[in-house]
Amino acid sequence: MKPAIPPTINLHTIRACNYGCKYCFAGFQDCDTGVMPQADLHEILRQFAATTGMAIHPAKVNFAGGEPMLSPTFVEDICYAKSLGLTTSLVTNGSLLSERLLDKLSGQLDLLTISIDSLKPGTNRAIGRTNRQNPLTVSEYLDRILKARTRGITVKLNTVVNRLNLDEDMTDFIREAQPIRWKLFKVLKIQNENSAHFDSWAIRDEEFVHFVERHRKVESSGVTLVPESNEQMYGTYGIISPDGRFIDNSQGTHRYSPRIVDVGITQAFADVNFSMAGFQQRGGIYSIKRSTTNRSLQTSALHPKRELTK
């Protein structure tokens, strides 16, 4: 029997992003709202929290985008989700993280996921993983990770494996960063989102496997490595668009449910295809353990420390 809703939802609160990653599939081209109204966002959170007994408790909400930190109310929204008893998670490119914001998120944000597709400035520029300034450096990533962890926020990393970063070796960085999990996605094609020039980024299954195997040794450092093929990503995520609708990506496109605030979260979710077995198989349920510091994460002479902008 299909669950009422998945135990984790990806709540895409905003379309805008300060980066321009060319293979991004979260542009929501058919979405008629740029930023989710806060009243709708909080209503969706309330409905989601009310169903946690049907899936897993505490249920988890991933705040995503676009770049969710561009929303002027993202800290307030995370705090509201936390007040409902939800596990809170933020997926960000990390460029807007500051000590001031991390101070506000301390005790409210359970999991910080930073998307890092390359450690090479030239590759990041070619991908579009930059804004008007230079891409983040290795030392800047490590500084953000350390400052989050010392505030009691667990850190996870995401990487999209594609044609440009396929031969990169990130082992030393991951060992130093010590995320609780490192998720590796094979670059995913979504029709009408990133399909126009997808061949420029696409890789073969065996190339993805080689990238994963090259990095298996990070597991000996206590990092959980989680690879996801395209097949594992289709139909296994509870995705909510900025206009408050579930998205069905099971057929390689985005098909939208009715608005949750109009029909209710259970009825809206019934309109999309979701595989709970697939969700579990890809490791969708896992423990988040906070740590205040990690001796493996030290800023070395090779990567001189840079302070965050307050």
Swiss-Prot record:
What CDD domains would the database entry show? Radical_SAM
Would the keyword Ribosomal protein turn up in this protein's UniProt record? no
Q: Which cofactors must be present for this protein to function?
A: [4Fe-4S] cluster
EC class: lyase
ATP-binding found in the keyword field: no
Query: Any idea of its EC number?
Result: 4.2.-.-
Q: Which Pfam families match?
A: Radical_SAM
Example GO BP: defense response to virus
- Residue ranges of every copy of the Radical SAM core domain listed in the record: 3-221
Keywords from UniProt, A to Z, are: 4Fe-4S, Antiviral defense, Iron, Iron-sulfur, Lyase, Metal-binding, S-adenosyl-L-methionine
**Domain of life the protein comes from:** Bacteria
Give the matching InterPro entries.
Aldolase_TIM, Elp3/MiaA/NifB-like_rSAM, RSAD2/Viperin_antiviral, rSAM
Its Gene Ontology molecular function terms? 4 iron, 4 sulfur cluster binding; lyase activity; metal ion binding
Positions binding [4Fe-4S] cluster in this chain are C17, C21, C24
The chemistry this enzyme catalyses reads:
GTP + AH2 + S-adenosyl-L-methionine = 3'-deoxy-3',4'-didehydro-GTP + 5'-deoxyadenosine + L-methionine + A + H2O + H(+)
Q: Relate the protein's function as given in its record.
A: Expression of pVip15 in E.coli (strain MG1655) confers resistance to phage T7; prevents culture collapse upon infection. Catalyzes the conversion of guanosine triphosphate (GTP) to 3'-deoxy-3',4'-didehydro-GTP (ddhGTP), probably via a SAM-dependent radical mechanism. The modified nucleotide represses transcription from T7 RNA polymerase-directed genes (possibly by acting as chain terminators), strongly suggesting these nucleotides block viral polymerase transcription.
Q: Which family does it belong to?
A: Belongs to the radical SAM superfamily. Viperin family.
Q: What is this protein identified as?
A: S-adenosylmethionine-dependent nucleotide dehydratase
Q: Which organism does this record belong to?
A: Coraliomargarita akajimensis (strain DSM 45221 / IAM 15411 / JCM 23193 / KCTC 12865 / 04OKA010-24)
Gene symbol of the encoding locus = vip15
